Amino acid sequence: GEPITITLSSSDLKRLATNEATSLSKMGFDSSDTFQMLLTLDRQFMAGIAYYSGILKLGASVVRNGPGGIVNQWKSIDKIRPTVLIAVPSFISKLIKYAEENEIDYKNSSVKSIVCIGEPIHNADFSQNILAKRITEKWGVRLCSTYASTEMATAFYQCGKNKGCHNNDDLLFTEILNDFGNPVSHGETGEIVITTLGV
């Protein structure tokens, strides 16, 4: 079908910035960090503008490098010296492969953490999946997981315990309901129902 277009007001953008700044802070990042974004702000990609706005609200530095361009990404890492990358994890595997093939000392780069978007990095039991292991076994960086959707205009974020993602209670109310609309008991399967707040 046709993609849905969701327009954003200035209030919506402020809400996105608040969500991402709070999420990044809870992940352990602060104004001393420098972020390199390996994702787009174009083509109505809400995550791009959300992360960018949130990083600015956090008071950190940011370079918007866009997706792709492996050579350019490594040049930017060498020149800007970011502490955090925001990227799709499968692209990080390509960065590592290129670095190894071109004798780039990526293990001693400035990058300490990667905020992973768009693909899972954990199994159902919260252990690292194959993709995450492939990255961390080669590059000793900390991986942080996020999950978001345009419709809820909010992201779930992973704290340092790596036992699942959290939401910002001021912006989102999350329920897991059965077929009759009642909350399920712990461990039961249900439908996730999201109520956005402040939209």
Q: What residue spans do the PLM features occupy?
A:
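Active-site phosphate/ATP/adenylate-binding loop shared across adenylate-forming ligases
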Residues: 1-138, 144, 161-163
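Conserved AMP-binding/adenylate-forming
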Residues: 126-199
